[in-house]
Regions:
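Short, structured patches in soluble enzyme cores that scaffold and shape functional sites
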Residues: 38-40, 92-94, 180-184, 256
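Aromatic/basic-lined ligand-recognition segments
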Residues: 17, 122-186, 194-195, 209-215, ...
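Hydrophobic, ordered structural segments
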Residues: 84-135
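Flexible helix-coil linker/hinge segments at domain or subdomain boundaries
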Residues: 112-122, 262, 266-303
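Short, conserved charged micro-motifs
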Residues: 43-49, 97-102, 189-190, 262-267
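Conserved mixed alpha/beta catalytic, RNA-binding, or beta-rich assembly cores of soluble enzyme
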Residues: 186-238, 245-251, 255-265, 273
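Short Lys/Arg-enriched alpha/beta "domain-start" segment
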Residues: 2-85, 124-132, 136, 140, ...
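Short, low-order "capping/linker" segments at domain edges
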Residues: 125-148, 293-320, 324, 331
Length: 333
């Protein structure tokens, strides 16, 4: 993990959101994520109209929603939003500007209402198509809050940028988040997820995607011609999946706050990998204390970075890939 000095990147183009999975176009699956905890505010009481406005600020829309006694889960045109009474998690992909939504939220509430703010941004396949860089986003955050910026992983490999607000925070012992970010789908998974003719019902039947963690209420959507998103909730817990089956850069994300027995995430990871069959993947784990390993049969650990944040969380980022067993052919462009 490396603490970053804030710099500025300049882009030559600002392009509109790309059409999903169009052959002559490109859609960026790599995501941006915001997690905010508040005090003295009931976020669910703000209502769908408020959250719809927050979502629209980053150039996305709410497609559908499900709710229970603990959480409202909104499926978005670009990923997902989960709202609890005292926190929310928002994930967006494509060329969305999640920083716009952050600003809209922070403009309404006082700094004293914010207990925790953590922003993640995965390095993109085509960063030149983005309207801002991570460093641009941080400069805008710091108009409202003080914080630190980090990079988990080497700059010339898969890596994760992270920004956290400077504020002491004591997370609950069970406040864990586990992410799996997958690349280059293979085999039958590639055929199923990249098939334009596949219906939502066929995807549900041919894969176990809705039952990676059993017992959850599920809301899912199949994009045209391809692409898939899923939200699932059970009590205060959620898991979410987003599939961008680009020929030139397929990407799938899985995330959950469900805590397995003895913090054994290997079983959940095995189920995720069975459904999507990636050539390589990252894991990102947030927990009050991380003193255990996550194992993946058949994959080689290439990168492991762990650090403790001011917010009271340990963060561990790992990158896994297939072992190199043969020479590949060059890709004809």
């Amino acid at each position: 993990m490396k603490l970053l000095k804030i710099a500025r990147f300049y882009h030559t183009k600002n392009l509109p959101i790309q059409m999903r999975c169009k052959r002559l176009d490109f859609f960026e699956g790599s995501e941006k994520k915001l997690e905010v905890y508040v005090k003295d505010v009931d976020l669910r009481a703000l209502g769908k109209e408020y959250w719809s406005g927050i979502v629209e600020r980053c150039q996305a829309k709410i497609l559908s929603s499900i709710s229970n006694d603990y959480c409202d889960a909104y499926l978005l045109s670009e990923s997902s939003l989960f709202v609890w009474k005292d926190s929310f998690t928002m994930i967006t992909c494509g060329t969305t500007m999640l920083v716009n939504s952050v600003e809209a939220f922070l403009e309404r509430f006082d700094r004293e209402n914010i207990s925790l703010l953590v922003y993640e941004r995965k390095n993109e396949y085509r960063p030149q198509l983005q309207k801002t860089s991570f460093f641009d986003d941080v400069k805008r955050f710091e108009k409202f809050v003080d914080g630190k910026a980090y990079r988990f992983g080497n700059v010339d490999e898969h890596h994760l940028f992270l920004y956290e607000m400077n504020n002491p925070y004591e997370p609950e012992p069970t406040d864990n988040t586990f992410e799996v970010l997958m690349y280059d789908l293979q085999g039958e998974a590639k055929k199923i997820w990249s098939c334009p003719k596949a219906t939502l019902e066929e995807i549900q039947t041919k894969t176990a995607v809705r039952n990676i963690i059993p017992g959850f209420q599920v809301d899912d959507f199949k994009f045209d011609p391809c692409g898939y998103s899923l939200n699932a909730i059970n009590g205060p817990h959620y898991f979410t999946i987003h599939v961008t089956p680009e020929e030139s850069g397929s990407y799938v994300s899985f995330e959950t706050n469900f805590q397995p027995e003895k913090n054994d995430y290997s079983k959940i990871l095995a189920g995720v990998l069975k459904v999507f069959q990636p050539r390589s993947f990252d894991t990102v784990l947030f927990a009050p204390r991380i003193n255990y390993k996550i194992l993946a049969d058949g994959f080689t650990l290439r990168t492991a970075v762990q650090s403790s944040l001011a917010s009271g969380f340990d963060v561990k980022y790992c990158h896994f890939s297939w072992p190199v067993e043969s020479v590949q052919s060059a890709k004809l462009l």
